[in-house]
Amino acid sequence: MNPENWLLLRRVVRFGDTDAAGVMHFHQLFRWCHEAWEESLEQYGLTPAEIFPGSRKSEVTPEVALPIIHCQADFRRPIHSGDALAMELRPERLNPNSFQVHFEFRCEEQIAAHALIRHLAINAKTRHRCALPEGIDRWLEASGVGKIGSI
C-alpha cells in the first residue's frame, strides 16, 4: 500500500468556499484540513465509525476521542473559486497519546497555504489522556512517521 494514496489528495475550490471578493475565506482552510484528514483515514482503510463518535453505521461509540488541542495556518497566496489544489498531509506522532498533521496546499505548483492541527487522545468517558486508538497508530506507522517526537 503506497502512502501517497492517502497522503496526497486533491480538491477544487468551490464558489461557496469563497467570500464576496471571490477569495477563499480563512476559516475554510481548517475545514479542508479536517476533511482531508478524514479522507486520508478512509483511503487508508479506516471507517468513520472506527474513529468518530456518532458516525452512521457505528454500533459502538469509540472509547477514545481525539479533540483538536492546537491549530495554526499561514496563507501564502489567494485561493480562488475554481482553483485545483493539491493537499499533502504529513502526520507526526508526538508521544503515545498525541499526534499532529502538517498540511501543505499547492495551487499551480505554488504553495498557497500551510496548516497544522494537533490532536490529543482522551478517554471519551473520563476525559483523561489515553493511548491513541489502534487505527490511528496503524495510520501513523504506515504513513512512515511512527517515531516519537517532542511536543
Curated annotation (Swiss-Prot):
Reaction equation(s) it catalyzes: 1,4-dihydroxy-2-naphthoyl-CoA + H2O = 1,4-dihydroxy-2-naphthoate + CoA + H(+)
EC number, as in UniProt: 3.1.2.28
UniProt keyword Hydrolase, yes or no: yes
Record-level GO BP terms: phylloquinone biosynthetic process
Pfam family, one: 4HBT_2
Pathway assignment: Cofactor biosynthesis; phylloquinone biosynthesis; Quinol/quinone metabolism; 1,4-dihydroxy-2-naphthoate biosynthesis; 1,4-dihydroxy-2-naphthoate from chorismate: step 7/7
InterPro entries, per database record: DHNA_CoA_hydrolase (IPR022829), HotDog_dom_sf (IPR029069)
Keyword Secreted included in the entry's annotation: no
MF (Gene Ontology): 1,4-dihydroxy-2-naphthoyl-CoA thioesterase activity
Catalytic site positions: 19
Keywords: Hydrolase
Broad EC category: hydrolase
CDD domains: 4HBT
Function noted in UniProt: Catalyzes the hydrolysis of 1,4-dihydroxy-2-naphthoyl-CoA (DHNA-CoA) to 1,4-dihydroxy-2-naphthoate (DHNA), a reaction involved in phylloquinone (vitamin K1) biosynthesis.
Family that this chain belongs to: Belongs to the 4-hydroxybenzoyl-CoA thioesterase family. DHNA-CoA hydrolase subfamily.
Protein name: 1,4-dihydroxy-2-naphthoyl-CoA hydrolase
Natural source organism: Prochlorococcus marinus (strain MIT 9303)
